[in-house]
Amino acid sequence: MEEMILEKDLLSITRKNVDAFLETHDVKYVAEDAVYKHLGTGDEYNGREAIGAMLNYMYHVAFDAHAEVTNKIITENKAMFEGKFIGRHIGEFAGIPPTNKEINVPICVCYDLEDGLIKKGRIYFLGDVLMKQLAQ
């Protein structure tokens, strides 16, 4: 019985942490040795600091953007969200100077979790959709 209660407590903490991360992108919810991989480009970000820098660049430097979550699943050791990366292109991205164009790009991220923190992230981002929107 005690083990079941502890599992429920960990799941509750994990859900709160993942929900908070999806809302804020605060890397305190990311393990120090976490790894993110962008499956479309092969780019890999190793460690909390590198992941934080990538998130800051995407959400605040290249774009003024946010993630709009349309679906999510959170378990004790896995999480997934599907949604849209929505915002405005305000800084250099992939050699393209700021266009000030609105963007709305489908995104899905799958996470491996450990002790309530994100340990691995696999990013599925439709870069071709983004590039079309920046070119229009």
Task: Tell me what each language-model feature is.
Residues 1-136:
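C-terminal and inter-domain tail/linker signature
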